[in-house]
Amino acid sequence: MLEATLNHRIGDFTLAVDLRLQSSGVCAIFGPSGCGKTTLLKALAGLLRTQGHVKFNGQCWQDQNTHVPAYERAAGFVFQDNRLFPHLDVASNLDFARQRAAKGRIEYQEVIDTLGVQSLLSRGITGLSGGEAKRVAIARALVSQPKILLMDEPLSGLDHASKQDILGYLRRLNQHFALPTLYVSHDIEEVARLCDHMVMMRSGQVVDMGPTAEIIQKLNQTSDQTAHPGGAVIHAKVSAHRADFSLTELDLAGHKLFAPIRSDLSIGETMQLFLPARDVALATQKPEGLSIRNTVPGIVDTLHADANDRIRVAIKVADQMLFAQITRQASEALALKPGLPVFALVKSVALD
């Protein structure tokens, strides 16, 4: 377990947090820019001196009389800007971390294979793409034999394809190494796709924490739908890969969904997805003759209006919840109300 009570003042900004987190899975530290996410992560890593205490798995990292330096905390840190040594090649960057690490359970070759960096080992840092450099930075953190991984906005600055690529690697790392991870982000979609739990921050304080799906469901009820465009974390099982159409077939509570092909996932594996509310349309009768391939029946659970006459509709599908964001005019035309059967229409590309 990670326990931390920290206070720190920087100019007009004050960090004041009290955390109790289980040492498993991927936990997001989420909130708007400037809320203190990176400051908190650096304090936990020992890169920033603060008042308070930090304890990890029973070991005191910081209290009134103790401050274990960053290099002794067994915490692997992945910086937003990677911090790789440009004068060394990839292999030497990894060796720099490996040679200074205590012996641990993480095997060097496993890291190389899992992150797909074998072909990069002889390359110089300056010649790497953004996604390649990020994989090397993650590999360097792992070969240092950490007991916990701390990641500061690791997808920042990457294009969409590279982000999806790195998210896939991060999911595999979580499954393969079972290393507890704290993941700083202000992007709700990447958090929903990757993280099991969330810590919500605002103005230097923790305002909520819990399972990702529950926290995002709370955000769907906010009156500020511009700040939180909303959506749902859904879990669907991989049932087939349709290579002829470059699609993966998913099972959501007995209903078929088609997503862009994810051949890295095994048949029977459960996939965690984020479905943005803006990408869900609604119908009161099953439509025909549409290009949209995903039609999921459900029941209207709640309707929540914002100040701009937009309605966020919660649709219950078995034990999961989808959300659609529509206009008030559309809601009234469909006569939507709790308990009404509807069909949720989802484009396959929305499940990328």
Model-based region annotation:
Residues 59-63, 103-120, 126, 171-172:
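Conserved ABC ATPase "signature" region
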Residues 61-76, 100:
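ABC ATPase NBD coupling module
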Residues 124-128, 132:
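Conserved ABC ATPase signature
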Residues 143-147:
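A short, proline-enriched helix->beta-strand linker immediately N-terminal to the Walker B motif
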Residues 149-153:
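Catalytic Walker B motif of ABC-type/P-loop ATPase nucleotide-binding domains
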Residues 175, 185-255:
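Internal alpha/beta loop-helix hairpins
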